[in-house]
């Protein structure tokens, strides 16, 4: 492990690989307890999470639903609920995967909020500030979608006395692969410190369908590139990112991309700059 790998792994609190199934089960239990502690210490009763159809929200949703079920069993308080929210931008190209994820999670409540009208309304109001190139306009619109999804989740959480769950994990955090104040905003992040293959392993431990566990990850924020794979945006694979974070050797080009991207996206992982 090179010094910079160790430094980055420590800053992101990267967890070691699961040694065996027992270690995986212990980590699942620890993260469920974390979710329960966050909620009970807040005095609130619900958890809210947007379900996209990807493995990250699937895994976070499975942890949240089990946490709520155990809290109800332990306390007898039926007010503890997990609310799963679908947040499509009009029609989502992989809606069948999103619905399959919600079905497998079996949340206490499920709702759908179409963010399309709100995003388009805002875009029309600020059109004078947009760039001249379609690609840059599409990129900005993608970030607006992510932020509108979080606005919706916090609105629901506020109305139901709840907390919002985030899906950030170490393999995305190191690349700054999230929208500031969009999917990067949340009250608790139960996947924090995990690499991508650990997120998948946890989903498998719940018996999740392999089609969802191994689905090609995509943020799906850009209209001009629907379903664009995360790895195409990264320039490296998640396997390489995972290996880097666990101190394993990776090809030099991948090493340089990860380190340089980590440095460039530093501002996304810290509190606002202040004098």
From Swiss-Prot:
GO terms for molecular function: ATP binding; glutaminase activity; metal ion binding; NAD+ synthase (glutamine-hydrolyzing) activity; NAD+ synthase activity. Coiled coil: none annotated. Its EC number is 6.3.1.5. Keywords: ATP-binding, Ligase, Magnesium, Metal-binding, NAD, Nucleotide-binding. It is an enzyme of class 6 (ligase). The keyword Transmembrane does not apply. Gene3D superfamilies: HUPs. Pathway: Cofactor biosynthesis; NAD(+) biosynthesis; NAD(+) from deamido-NAD(+) (ammonia route): step 1/1. It comes from the Bacteria. It catalyses: deamido-NAD(+) + NH4(+) + ATP = AMP + diphosphate + NAD(+) + H(+). Pfam families: NAD_synthase. One of its GO terms (cellular component) is cytoplasm. InterPro entries: NAD/GMP_synthase (IPR022310), NAD_synthase (IPR003694), NH(3)-dep_NAD(+)_synth (IPR022926), Rossmann-like_a/b/a_fold (IPR014729). GO terms for biological process: NAD biosynthetic process. Deamido-NAD(+) binds at residues 147, 180, 187, 267-268. The keyword Signal does not apply. ATP binds at residues 50-57, 167, 196, 218. Mg(2+) binds at residues 56, 172. HAMAP family: NadE_ammonia_dep. Belongs to the NAD synthetase family. Catalyzes the ATP-dependent amidation of deamido-NAD to form NAD. Uses ammonia as a nitrogen source. Homodimer. This is NH(3)-dependent NAD(+) synthetase. The lineage of its organism: Bacteria, Pseudomonadati, Pseudomonadota, Gammaproteobacteria, Pseudomonadales. The gene is nadE.
């Amino acid at each position: 492990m090179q010094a910079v790998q160790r430094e980055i792994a420590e800053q992101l609190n990267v967890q070691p690989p699961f040694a065996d199934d027992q270690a995986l089960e212990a980590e699942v239990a620890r993260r469920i307890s974390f979710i329960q502690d966050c909620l009970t210490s807040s005095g609130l009763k619900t958890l809210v999470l947007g379900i996209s159809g990807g493995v990250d929200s699937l895994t976070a949703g499975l942890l949240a639903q089990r946490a709520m079920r155990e809290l109800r069993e332990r306390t007898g308080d039926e007010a503890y609920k997990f609310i799963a929210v679908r947040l499509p931008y009009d029609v989502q190209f992989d809606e069948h995967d999103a619905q399959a994820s919600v079905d497998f999670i079996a949340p206490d409540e499920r709702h759908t909020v179409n963010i399309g009208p709100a995003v388009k309304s805002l875009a029309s109001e600020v059109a004078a500030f947009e760039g001249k190139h379609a690609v840059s306009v599409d990129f900005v619109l993608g970030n607006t979608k992510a932020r509108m999804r979080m606005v919706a989740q916090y609105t629901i959480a506020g109305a139901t006395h709840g907390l919002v769950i985030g899906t950030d994990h170490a393999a995305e955090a190191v690349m700054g692969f999230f929208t500031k104040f969009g999917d990067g905003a949340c009250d608790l992040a139960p996947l924090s410190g995990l690499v991508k293959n650990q997120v998948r392993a946890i989903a498998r431990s719940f018996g999740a369908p392999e089609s969802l566990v191994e689905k090609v990850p995509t943020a799906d924020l850009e209209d001009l590139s629907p379903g664009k794979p995360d790895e195409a945006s990264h320039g490296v694979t998640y396997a390489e990112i995972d290996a880097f974070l666990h101190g394993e050797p990776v090809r030099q080009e991948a090493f340089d991309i990860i380190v340089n991207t980590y440095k460039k996206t530093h501002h996304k992982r810290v509190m606002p700059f202040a004098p």
